Design a protein with these regions (language model features):
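Expand to "…catalyze enediolate/carbanion chemistry for C-C bond making/breaking, isomerization
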Residues: 1-206
């Protein structure tokens, strides 16, 4: 990696693709994380998970009726997230090659977000708007994230039937606000209840 470091000039970013058999070895993954932090700490735009090539390492291809999380790669993705996201890297989820199956793509996108992935690689132009819309932030999450990040927020407070704790949820809130900045927020009609920390939202998609 040191040799590659000198090829990356100022104001340029790189996106590495994790797609070879070494990524099934968590020792290798830990070593790579350390090397990236040392050599490319500020230049890494994103780490892309190459799902199809990782499946190929196992002599597999994704079935047409399965999300990536229904395959062995579904066990690998949380491990990669657990190594890289706490270190400050963002991950891109694998492509969904069965581009005509929109409902299954949307299901996979929902699971991508649950697993902490910030974006998804598109394999076909018809997927771009679907991916972008899926990563828009729900208004409830957006406003709760704002409340959590408020410097005057209480240590624990309630909102929309949930308990929020800034000390615990701050990283989540920052992730939500980052997504909102990139993808936008689903339009909402706001109605504040008697307590300002309780927000009732009716969301509607554009």
């Amino acid at each position: 990696l040191e040799a590659w470091r000198y090829c990356v000039t100022a104001h340029r970013h790189v996106m590495l693709t994790m797609e070879s058999h070494e990524y099934f070895d968590m020792g290798y993954v830990a070593d790579l994380k350390s090397a990236l932090l040392t050599n490319f700490n500020k230049e890494i735009l994103c780490l892309r998970i190459g799902g199809n090539d990782l499946l190929s390492c196992l002599n597999l291809r994704r079935p047409k009726d399965c999300t990536i999380y229904d395959t062995p790669i579904g066990l690998l993705i949380p491990q990669l997230v657990g190594h890289f996201v706490p270190a400050g890297f963002q991950l891109s989820s694998p492509v969904f090659e069965h581009y005509s199956n929109t409902p299954l793509l949307k299901k996979e996108l929902a699971l991508d977000k649950v697993n902490g992935l910030l974006t998804k690689t598109a394999i076909h132009p018809s997927q771009l708007n679907i991916i972008h819309d899926a990563y828009k932030v729900n208004s409830i999450d957006y406003y709760e994230a704002q409340m959590i990040m408020d410097a005057n927020a209480k240590s624990v407070f309630k909102s929309n039937g949930s308990m929020l704790e800034p000390a615990t949820h701050r990283n989540w809130a920052q992730h939500i606000l980052t997504r909102a900045q990139i993808y936008g927020v689903i339009e909402s009609h706001l109605q504040f209840a008697e307590h300002p920390s309780k927000i009732v939202l009716c969301t509607r998609q554009k």
